[in-house]
C-alpha cells in the first residue's frame, strides 16, 4: 500500500512540475526535485535509524509520518497549472491518447533508445562498486561512509550545478557536456583498479563519479520533462521514466560476467565506452525537438 501510494504521488508530482515550470526553469526544477528526493532518503534512512537507537520504532514511524505535513502544506500552497486543455474524462483520453500522441512524433523510437542508453555507462560503473571496493580490501565501514556520505553530498551538488548549467547553456549542450563527463568520470575507477587499496583515490573516484552523474541526471530529467505534451504529462512522463529501469535490466546480466572474465580495469574501460550509444542517439536531438529546447 505504501509503495502504491508513493508511486502514485511521484507521478502526480512529476506531472505537476512539468506543467508548472517554464522551459527555462526545467533544469533548475529538476535539480531541486532531486535534492528533495535525496534529503528524503537521508531522513527516512540514516536519520530514522539513528532515532531508532534512542526510541521505539512506533515513535520513529510517527515522526516520519508527521514529517509529511511539510509536503501536504506545500501541496496546498502550490499553484495550479495554467492549462487551456481539458482534463481527460475517459480511460482512452487519459492513457491511450498520450501514447498515440508520443509515438506519432518524428523520431519517437530514437528518443526512447536515447533514454535507455544515455546513462548506461554510469549504471555499469556503479553496479559493481561495492564488490569492487571490497575486493580491493576496503572495509564496509569505509565504503558506507564514503558512498553514503560524500557520495550523497556530491550527487546533490551535481544535480544543483547541473540544473543551473542547463538553464545557462541550454538543454542540448548540457546533455552533451554531462554525457561526456559521465563517461570520463568512470575512468576514475580504472585508476583506482590500477592503484589498488588507495583510500584518497577511492574517495576521489566516488566523489567525481557522483558529481558528474548528478549533473547528468539533472539534464536528463529536464529533457524528459521537455518531451511531455502538457495535455498528457502524467502518462507520458511515467512512460519515459519507466524506460530508465530498462537500463538496469540490460546491465544486470552481463556486468558480473564481464568483470570476472576480463578483470576490473577492462570492465571500467567498457563502462566508459558504454556512453557511446547514448551520445550517438543524441546526434538526432534537433530532429526530436525541431530545433527547440536547444
Could you tell me what each predicted segment is?
Residues 18, 23-32, 140-141, 230-240:
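Loop-to-transmembrane helix entry/capping segments in MFS-fold secondary transporters
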Residues 66-85, 281-286:
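C-terminal membrane-cytosol helix-exit motif in multi-pass small-molecule transporters
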Residues 80-112:
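Juxtamembrane intracellular "pre-TM" segments in multi-pass secondary transporters
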Residues 106-145:
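Extracytoplasmic gate region of multi-pass secondary transporters
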Residues 27-48, 52, 241-252:
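Glycine-rich segments within core transmembrane alpha-helices of 12-TM secondary carriers
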Residues 157-174, 259-260:
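Helix-to-loop junctions at the C-terminal end of transmembrane segments
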Residues 180-197:
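C-terminal ends and interior cores of transmembrane alpha-helices
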Residues 7-21, 215-229:
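Intracellular juxtamembrane helix-capping segments at the cytosolic ends
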